[in-house]
Amino acid sequence: MKIVVLGAGAWGTALAMSAAAHAACHEVTLWARDAQQAQAMQAKRQNQRYLPGLAFPPGLHVASGDMGALAADADLVVVGTPMAALRGMLERLDGCAAPIAWLCKGFEADTGLMAHEVCAQVAPRLHSGVFSGPSFAQEVATAQPTAMVAASPRATVRDALVQAFHGPALRVYASEDIVGVEVGGAVKNVLAIATGLCDGLQLGMNARAALITRGLAEMTRLGLALGARPETFMGLSGLGDLVLTATGDLSRNRRVGLLLAEGRTLAQAVESLGHVAEGVYSARTVVQRARAVGVEMPIAECVVALLDGELRAAEAVARLMEREPTVERH
């Protein structure tokens, strides 16, 4: 099976390493936009920028240059770029015959669209889906046990992802609910900023548990309003990804909350990360999309107010705690 991973960031690199490591029959190519970066990775057999010290398996080749030619010869194309770059990548891949899956999590900032909606706009002929779930790149690259979801309305896409990545260290489940999987992946990043703030302010484990639980309710309400299945949010791409991102020390979005709690500005927090924290860029869009369908998301709204500088950390906590009493809704 010929697998092409487009984008040599931490996550694209980790999945390319995973596919090459567990199946000798796979031909895996990791494509980097920068030719010098590609040459350095191929020569040194590691991604020193994002996953330093982790050696590439023998079956992994690194390339740059003509992305279209690589995709045209592939059995599966995986797009490992951030959400902001997805539209341009899909436009370049329009007409590709191979199944295509993206890894990004979020809503497109300018349009409020989910990834599959962007694809329907710019490349409707593609057989496409999303590969998502509770997974840190570092752990996937070091073959620590992980479970993910391959979601697409097309069985060919789901089957290709299972064939490419299911192995001893990575268990892949299939789902038809691409809406639910994408909503879960987008909203959990926003909620992780809130739990990072909670932990940074040392509000305690009770507060963290409340944020995760009520955050899951917000995620579910938005997903159902957009056409998702309720059971998806109890699965890997919902509850699973939320728990990991909200509590894990490798979570960039949680780290943003921790830095804000220290008194850093948003610009300082983002600069110190060195990687993309999708929750920062998708928070406003999540809230806008929720308002458009009449869904209340008080935690996400507080995160946006905090990121915009309209609330201080202590004020955000007070706003949530002083809301009118209500029945518990999911």
From Swiss-Prot:
Disulfide cross-links: none
Record protein name field: Glycerol-3-phosphate dehydrogenase [NAD(P)+]
UniProt pathway: Membrane lipid metabolism; glycerophospholipid metabolism
A Pfam cross-reference name: NAD_Gly3P_dh_N
Gene3D superfamilies per the UniProt record, alphabetical: N-(1-d-carboxylethyl)-l-norvaline Dehydrogenase, domain 2, NAD(P)-binding Rossmann-like Domain
Function: Catalyzes the reduction of the glycolytic intermediate dihydroxyacetone phosphate (DHAP) to sn-glycerol 3-phosphate (G3P), the key precursor for phospholipid synthesis.
Binding locations of sn-glycerol 3-phosphate: 105, 133, 135, 188, 241, 251-253
Keyword hit for Transport: no
GO molecular function: glycerol-3-phosphate dehydrogenase [NAD(P)+] activity; NAD binding
Gene of this entry: gpsA
PROSITE patterns: NAD_G3PDH (PS00957)
Gene Ontology CC, one term: cytosol
Annotated NCBIfam families: PRK00094.1-2, PRK00094.1-4
Primary localization class, coarse: cytoplasm
InterPro entries in UniProt: 6-PGluconate_DH-like_C_sf (IPR008927), 6PGD_dom2 (IPR013328), G3P_DH_NAD-dep (IPR006168), G3P_DH_NAD-dep_C (IPR006109), G3P_DH_NAD-dep_N (IPR011128), NAD(P)-bd_dom_sf (IPR036291)
Enzyme class: oxidoreductase
EC number, UniProt record: 1.1.1.94
